C-alpha cells in the first residue's frame, strides 16, 4: 500500500485522468473531491461491497426458466 500525506487543497493523480483532491479536514474527517472520466465508476467502499453482495446473491438464485420455453420455439 502506498501511503501519502497531503495538505488541504493538495492532490494526487491516479494515472493521467483521475485526480483526488483534499477539499477540507474537519473534526477528524477528510473531505475528498474526485475528478474522473464519466465512465469511471466511483463508490464508497461500503456501498461497493453491498453491490458485490447483491450481485453475488442474484447470480446464485435459482431461476424458473420454464415460462420462457414457448418464446424460443421455431414456427
Curated annotation (Swiss-Prot):
Gene Ontology cellular component annotations, sorted alphabetically: cytosol
Subcellular localization, as worded in the UniProt entry: Cytoplasm
Main location: cytoplasm
Pfam families associated with the record: CsrA
GO MF annotation: an example: mRNA 5'-UTR binding
SUPFAM superfamilies: CsrA-like (SSF117130)
Domain of life: Bacteria
Keyword hit for Cytoplasm: yes
Keywords for the protein's UniProt record, in alphabetical order: Bacterial flagellum biogenesis, Cytoplasm, Repressor, RNA-binding, Translation regulation
Gene3D superfamilies for the chain: Translational regulator CsrA
GO BP annotations, alphabetical order: bacterial-type flagellum organization; mRNA catabolic process; negative regulation of translational initiation; regulation of bacterial-type flagellum assembly; regulation of carbohydrate metabolic process
Family note: Belongs to the CsrA/RsmA family.
Subunit: Homodimer; the beta-strands of each monomer intercalate to form a hydrophobic core, while the alpha-helices form wings that extend away from the core.
Functional note: A translational regulator that binds mRNA to regulate translation initiation and/or mRNA stability. Usually binds in the 5'-UTR at or near the Shine-Dalgarno sequence preventing ribosome-binding, thus repressing translation. Its main target seems to be the major flagellin gene, while its function is anatagonized by FliW.
Protein name, as recorded: Translational regulator CsrA
Phylogenetic lineage: Bacteria, Bacillati, Bacillota, Clostridia, Peptostreptococcales
Amino acid at each position: 500500500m502506498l501511503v501519502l500525506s497531503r495538505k488541504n487543497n493538495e492532490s494526487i493523480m491516479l494515472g493521467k485522468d483521475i485526480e483526488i483532491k483534499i477539499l477540507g479536514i474537519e473534526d477528524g474527517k477528510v473531505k475528498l473531491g474526485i475528478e474522473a472520466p464519466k465512465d469511471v465508476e466511483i463508490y464508497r467502499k461500503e456501498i461497493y461491497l453491498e453491490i458485490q453482495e447483491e450481485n453475488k446473491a442474484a447470480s446464485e438464485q435459482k431461476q424458473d426458466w420454464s415460462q420462457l420455453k414457448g418464446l424460443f420455439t421455431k414456427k
